[in-house]
Amino acid sequence: YNIDKFHHAVLADDQVVFCVAKNHPLAGREVVSIQDMAKQPLIFFNADSVQNQLLKLRFELEGYTPNIIMRSSQIYTTLQFLKTDRYACFLYSSMTDKFPEIIGIPMQTPIRVKIGMIWKKSRYISSDMQTLISFTKKYYQMHSLIPSDKKTSGD
């Protein structure tokens, strides 16, 4: 994509973490490697997610194939599998504090992700869409996941 043709707002800067239940064998680790994760039965988000593409590429670059046993777009379903202490998944670190029954373990080589919104510069933006954009920007300013000095906006 040619980013010059879009307005954009970065809302969050986060990292992907390896998530397991508190009693999972890897729960006590400070960090996990791709090699460690490749041995685990993994639940990935649906195939078209950016997170999946980044994870699959990381596994491939390090010469491993992830042991994907299921794909789901439902976090609740994924968490039910994790509670059995046999499975693992990947979430953004900012999400893990919302689920006290799981532990998010940083990856040895982190995958950082900027989360934001983009919209075409050349398109008409309805007042409802402008309201949504303004609301979202204000919300993330008040509930920031990134320091205010690192926020960028390409309005």
Residue ranges and their predicted role:
Residues 2-15, 76-122:
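Beta-alpha-beta core module
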Residues 21, 45-46, 91-92:
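Thr-Gly-centered strand-to-loop micro-motif
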Residues 65-74:
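Short beta-strand-to-loop elements that line the ligand-binding cleft
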Residues 5-16, 20-42, 127-129:
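Flexible hinge/capping segments at coil-to-helix
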Residues 105-146:
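A late-sequence structural motif
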